[in-house]
Amino acid sequence: MPKSQIVEPTKERQAGIIPFGEVPLNQYQSDVAGEKKTYGEEALLGIYEDMLLIREFESMLQSIKTQGSYEGIEYDHKGPAHLSIGQEASAVGQAFLLDVDDHILGSHRSHGEILAKGMSAIRKLDDDSLLSIMKDFLGGDCFRVVEKDGGSDVKQLARDFLLYGALAEIFGRENGFNRGLGGSMHAFFPPFGILPNNAIVGGSADIATGAALFKKVNRKSGLVISNIGDASMGCGPTWEAMNFASMRQFHELWEESMRGGLPIIFNFMNNFYGMGGQTAGETMAFDYLARVGAGVNPQSMHAERVDGYNPLAVADAIRRKRELIKKGEGPILLETITYRFSGHSPSDASSYRIKEEIEAWQSFDPINSYARELSDAGILNEQAIASRKSEVVAAMTKAFGLASDLEVSPRLPSEKIAGLMFSSRKRESYDPDRKPELLLAHEENPRAQALAKKSRAGVIDGKPVSKNKVFQYRDAIFEAALHRFETDPTMVAYGEENRDWGGAFACYRGLTESLPYHRLFNSPISEAAIVGTACGYALEGGRVLVELMYCDFMGRAGDEIFNQLAKWQSMSACILEMPVTLRVSVGSKYGAQHSQDWCALVNHIPGLKVVFPSTPYDAKGMLNTALAGSDPVIFFESQRLYDIGELFEKEVPAEYYEVPFGPPAQRRVGKDITLITVGATMYRALEAADILEQKYGVTCDVFDCRSISPLDYDPLIASVQKTGKVLLSSDACERGSVLHDIGSKISQLAFDDLDAPPVVVGSRNWITPCAEVESDFFPQPSWIIDAIHDRILPLPGHSLTTNPTTGELIKRQRGGV
């Protein structure tokens, strides 16, 4: 919402025609002979060798999957293998001119890209650097295996290291590049510029965009390539990523020194099929995929179709597009046409295409075609071809023998996986040697000045401080965010209304004055891209604070939260960190699509930390904890609470402090019943506790589960052992809620101490109704008291106002409500 950009009605209503530029198709006209002077014979020969290496690697996997052996060595590989036989030229041509600082992210079919980029890096790095990388990576576990039988040639040793590390990873071995936790579809090796490959179609698009954002914001060298297939053009996150990468603010609103597009190439490896569907002609609208660029920005993303069966054509395209990126003219769209001779996977019989089509493409086999060009240019002869093929088979047999041997390459003990779900590292700054870029000193920030005049105590002389004078929950969010911005120069924040507007519910009001555009900006209303780019930014080594305005919007970012944010730390064996805090606001009064509490969804997903603070003190302390850690945190906030003051602690300190994840907060001490709450329901539970004590003489332990995962059960169990009775309540729908999970564990851990089963009082299993009747949907104090009376402890003289009976519960479940 920049006031500098005026939307003029006269201009916007003018008649006219939108022009579209031409999209080049397969324009490269040179050959090996023509490029001999440019690249030299050795480099041109290296292209051939790398293509041979990839072909043999993939053929080996094909043989293992279909015949159970390779070169006489038997092996049963139970995992997946999505092969790129036939696509070698596109991978090698792309990697040919890339530097180590250029990063690639791929798909489920990226073995070839891993090897191509790895070999490119090996050729560009000096021997000392290579030895240092190999010896240091994973404590040298992978290197020691290949070093035993390796020679003195460091480049050859590095090649063996690359082959073994990748293959051991595919086979799920502890010496693999990711400890065997990534496997075939997720293998990667950051020291060579190979970032995670992704099993989700199109999954690398927004992650790569975030990686490019990191490079731009932090002024890092190199570009980023998202290698995704033609089928990914049918995925919403791919479109969101291209739009995000093309935002005009990069050129028009960011500071002068930061202007220019993101350094990213969206490279669509177009092999013409997505599973069993043919893209152009059947499942997509385009004829040429490159045409899509015209719909994204006025430059048509500099889109181009490139002949991916000619490695030199691909290398030429990368060279030209790199120059555009250096000029700040990214993003780029490349359609690299190629063809897979094998099926989608070894079990695919290719019943959706005819034999003649496959044979037609095989007649243009890129390896054979390129070998002929090398021969015609006097660089390679038949004897040399045979020799190189023999060398590749020998290297592959050696790597396969080592990777398939359980004594040499054991599997990671399963019990160690638990220790790799989180990195759990304290990171005050991800670039401690750099000063954060700020527009104002802390004491000059207008909101910080205003907060200095507010009461940090919510209660004075037994009376609550008025809303306009008290330090509120939203102020706690602001202070924690500003502190980390002033500490960590890599930290950025973005979302749908972060700049100028002041963030959702005014939590960021005052940040715009302190932060340059590249550290705080508005994103498109693209929840998948918001979370996906945050993942990529974090994987590159930066801290991100992003928000979804309403919890209900998490569905738009389901894959990015459940499969990307949650899993990359553990799939990398914590080589990578994921310092992303995702703020999620839980609404009320806004109906069925804006008033849901989905804590249970993310609590179910391994790899996420989930918190839901309900007081200003906890909000600031827990956000400080999240923003000083290395793990992904889903940070729930209730819209009911943004304007409340601190009612439990003496005050909210102005100084920095942290509230640890895990322990629940005890808000009330009693002896008769344990009440456990999540979120804003805690305040209604306290109302119920007051009524129970005043009217019935029943006192309650009241716990606030501000940390959902992790959760320390010891205080809860100690309370239940004292009271023998427990009721749990939150604003989430009752069915499948976090409360049932907590209640179930309490039953297991304190069964002998319970006088009655744990009782859950959640919201009704309906859609959220209009604001006027929300009291019939969300838990109320009377609901809690009725449930206690009917199912836990009869209260003398109490009359039910609701129907909390088990019979009613059975009836509702029978009806699905």
What residue spans do the PLM features occupy?
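Acidic-glycine-rich active-site phosphate/pyrophosphate-binding loop
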Residues: 60-61, 172-188, 218-219, 290-291, ...
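Short coil/turn connectors at secondary-structure junctions
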Residues: 44, 48, 77-78, 99-103, ...
